[in-house]
Amino acid sequence: MARYDHLPIYRAAFDLAVHIEKIVRHFSRYHKYTLGTELRDTSRYILERIIEANNSHDRASLLLALRQDLERFKVLARLCHESGGFANTRAYLHVAEQVVAIAKQNEGWLRQT
């Protein structure tokens, strides 16, 4: 099994997952158990995709799937922001910036493949 913890994209995705866990803890009950759960699950799934892509010979298809997962996460985060899940706009913007940074790294990795 290939090492993945040294990858910048993995570290960024891990930081995002930890950040989401901390933020969702402070959501209202409604948002915590609906959109919050989806955000948490998707952030963990993004980590799994990165590990799978690092270990696979067919990396391109997994990175394309990761692109879709990141888009799904962006939509969920925006929906959560628009419906009042995030405490403030700054919290949402921080998450959005992290996702964009991961997406850029994914595109660079995809170009190399």
What are the language-model segments listed below?
Residues 1-113:
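Amphipathic alpha-helical assembly/interaction segments
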